[in-house]
Amino acid sequence: FYHPEKYFLPEEVVIKPTIGELFDEFLNKHPLSEVRKKNFRVVKRALLRYELYVRATKRGQKGFILDVDLVTPDTLRDMWDFFQNEYQYYELYPSIYEAIPEKRTPQPRSKNTLIDCFSRIRTFFLWCFDNKRTTNRPFDKFPIEECTYGTPYYITLEERDRIFNADLSATPQLAIQRDIFIFQTLIGCRVSDLYRMTKLNVVNEAIEYIPKKTKEGNPVTVRVPLNDKAKEILERYKEYEGKLLPFISEQKYNDAIKKIFKLAGVDRIVTILDPLTHNEIKRPIYEVASSHLARRTFIGNIYKKVKDPNLVSALSGHKEGSKAFRRYRDIDEEMKKDLVKLLD
């Protein structure tokens, strides 16, 4: 009677899952696209490295375990500091990176990247709370700021045509990537969606696809009619087998775009936000051009003419009310001039 442990049946012993095991359960049960799962796994590995870092560096913490029930806003601040400076710890504590490696050497994380990481950690904690894995809600007292972005810059139709008509016969490989870039400016998809396209995505003189990024919510088929330029480009590559166009790796595509802009003489200065310092800096557009500029060019130029976000997002595959899409509203000086002229 006085020895209750004698009556405690072995199956009642509850072994508490580690944060890694909980994270795996979250990834299995929470509806996420493959792309987002990959992003969450990056955060999971960083959390496990944080655990090892605390054990290695903090006095009396050799047995430290990151326990969802015990994380406080102070823990989150310490984690933020670790995430921010992790690129320095890579060389100081190599054993941590041998235990939980990354493909790429850690680089300084910008504030937007840190905000993204901690938004994912918050999503994980809310899932743990909603699924009765913890009663702890450390993010209630740890607010996360919104990401800061500059106003999107894009190329004008005149600049696009200059690139389309540039003589790149001396560099045939660049000429192919130029055609792909122009095609992307005419259908406005993300590069990940472009690279999955085959001839089967061409349906009744339009491109049809389901954006990968919105797949996990409610998949929507985006249909973008092909204009004459887009048809002309597809005609050039109709003999090409396999994918829709001769794609190369995304990194090489981005490098090619910069060279193409320079050769075509598209060199106007644009203002961008430095991702690490958040200071405005001026750069020639060919230094910062990338595949995403093709998407912005499609959206920006249509938005300028149509000014109806719902119509444009039907073509761009943005979710309704997307924060990314809102940035296009403060995009165009001419539009602002048109509006104030109404008051003349």
Per-segment meaning from a language model:
Residues 126-136, 184-206:
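Short, charged phosphate-coordinating catalytic segments
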Residues 169-171, 239-243, 258-314, 318:
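Short, basic (Lys/Arg/His-rich) helix/loop patches that form interaction surfaces
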Residues 111, 168-182, 305:
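Conserved catalytic core of the tyrosine transesterase superfamily
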Residues 24-35, 44-151, 166:
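N-terminal core-binding DNA-recognition domain of tyrosine recombinases/integrases
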Residues 196-202, 303-305, 313-320, 327-331:
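A short, basic/aromatic helix-end/turn motif that makes direct DNA contacts
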Residues 1-32:
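N-terminal helical hairpins
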Residues 213-215, 250-253, 316-341:
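Catalytic-site neighborhood detector that most strongly recognizes the C-terminal catalytic loop/helix
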Residues 187, 196-235:
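Conserved tyrosine-mediated DNA breakage-rejoining catalytic core shared by Y-recombinases
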